[in-house]
Amino acid sequence: MMKNLVVILGPTASGKTRLAVRLARDLKSEIVSADSRQVYRGMDIGTGKDLDEYRIDGEEIPCHLIDIVDPDYDFNVFEYQSRFYRCFEEILSRGIVPILVGGTGLYLSAVLENYRMVQVPENLDLRESLKAEPLERLQQILLEITPRIHNTTDLLDRGRLLRAIEIAQHSGRRGLRESPEHPRIEPLVFGVRWNRDLLRKRIALRLKERLSAGLIDEVKELHQSGISWDRLEFFGLEYRYVGLYLQSRMSYREMAEKLTIHICRFAKRQETWFRRMERHGIEIIWIEGDDYEALKEQLKGNLRS
């Protein structure tokens, strides 16, 4: 069956965007981002948007789902999936096979594994009525509504318990906003992988480049614009540790060292997620390093024209 979507996934610093841009130029295609942080405006260096990479030989490659919301907006996987489906169908309607590129495993899985989701709003009245209840009582309430709990960690954390009760109480009611019927997706999925030592070196080099490019100033300006330090931590490792440095809670050297260590650990977690996707039936064709010719060879005869 001919494929109608090319996917290029990989851990941070693997060079997947550069490969995707080259491919988009050769196929006259367009890129759709699968990155949970690049949706935010004004967060460029820390999220690794590398917008210059979308220009190749003087040609600008169209890209979607980048810079679409402000940092104070709570973007989520439900909204990502909905927006992706709209992008996918619109691009495909013009006779173009889109290229999905990114490393946010949850977003990739939501699309490729066809997650069926229901968006449940917070119930402030319910939360107010339960705020004085002890943990044991909240556990009892949840188990009374849904005796079979799939995620037992919901029973151990107060915040997760309240959210689980909200969702359980809404289950089966009318008026819920459900994820849209998904279009038929026939993906050809490529994964970019590197030798572990080489990937560590790439991560360290890219962090050094980002710090030189003004990462610290970016975080400082975001905070001065009204984004709290706590909120900045939500956006990931770079914003968390640079924020700690700007608050004089660690030295520059300590910040750089901790960032390198934790970004490497994050890359390992990304690789673990990709293996999980394979176990769930997603076939991934692995490309060693940035071997563009190997990627092109695998594409032959597979794409919808």
From Swiss-Prot:
Keywords: ATP-binding, Magnesium, Nucleotide-binding, Transferase, tRNA processing. GO terms for biological process: tRNA modification. GO terms for molecular function: ATP binding; tRNA dimethylallyltransferase activity. Substrate binds at residues 12-17. ATP binds at residues 10-17. Catalyzes the transfer of a dimethylallyl group onto the adenine at position 37 in tRNAs that read codons beginning with uridine, leading to the formation of N6-(dimethylallyl)adenosine (i(6)A). HAMAP family: IPP_trans. This is tRNA dimethylallyltransferase 1. The gene is miaA1.
